[in-house]
């Protein structure tokens, strides 16, 4: 198929390890466009990149213009501005909502979202709640969403896999908290990529949710033992009840070098069983699922970065000179976001009577004026 005749597919989160693995496969059928916060040239399956900050609705609208299909791989685990107020769940909602609004405006036919497995007992950590919330927000503006829910993705550059691999490499004797007895169903990166490729542009999978996982279910301790075998390391695992989640976060960060902001929500999720529900998707796609041991060996053999992208602590000069501030509030019954905003702009100049005035412009919205200085 000639490049000009290929449908245009937009990938948000193109620089992540899943996005990098996806593009070469999808490029066989699509004109693949990656979204990036900074300007960059196409390559490795991406026909082009578009500069886009998903915290800006206007940026999102420009970036999705002309697209037919979209894949959403964004997860705001680490700060991306000079000053960030709000946690990862708040930031994720803003980006997902902007993306969904822009997709609806651009006439996108389908959004494919890579989310997280949900425990069968219904209990969710904040991290897993955020994944479900993003799934809901993406579907909130009329574009059909196909969701693949996965647990730990076994890929060389994946942050979760790198954390586990570094623990095994650096600790000959591993003192294991209770959560290491929790059952999990990880999945090979290659399987995830194949299944995403399969569901894109298939109407039968619009507005559907699929759990994906390896053929077997193991505990986290067994998963670390598999990693030790793949690395050729002899390791001893000692179960303890002493390590609290807080202590676990601290020692994992110290041993692996992973930022605590990344480790904390992941550790919170480890007490929940991450087991895939029944799904015929792999069979339908003709995919023979990769065993966890094989997936781990492939991940270790892969040419992954010395320092994973998610582990890098940005220097102050690397972050945009921006403030990202997101606060949530519970609206009283009968209120809307607009009525709350209007009440705020009426209250603020009364509270700061001699300091601040609020001007309303029908085209531009509201502006705030510091009275003593005349600064808008």
What is the predicted function of each stretch?
Residues 31-37:
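Conserved glycine-rich Rossmann-like NAD(P)H-binding loop of the short-chain dehydrogenase/reductase
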Residues 105-110, 143:
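A short helix->loop->beta-strand "cap" motif at the edges of active sites that frequently abuts
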Residues 3, 198-262, 273-375:
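Mid/C-terminal beta-alpha module of Rossmann-like enzyme folds, strongest
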Residues 121-233, 250, 257:
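Oxidoreductase cofactor-interface core, primarily capturing Rossmann-like NAD(P)-dependent enzymes
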Residues 19-20, 93, 132:
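Residues forming the Rossmann-fold NAD(P)(H) cofactor-binding site
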Residues 40-106, 117-121:
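NAD(P)H-binding glycine-rich loop region in Rossmannoid oxidoreductase-like domains
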Residues 12, 35, 73-74, 111-117, ...:
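SDR active-site strand-loop-helix element
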Residues 2-29:
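N-terminal Rossmann NAD(P)H-binding glycine-rich loop of SDR-like oxidoreductase domains
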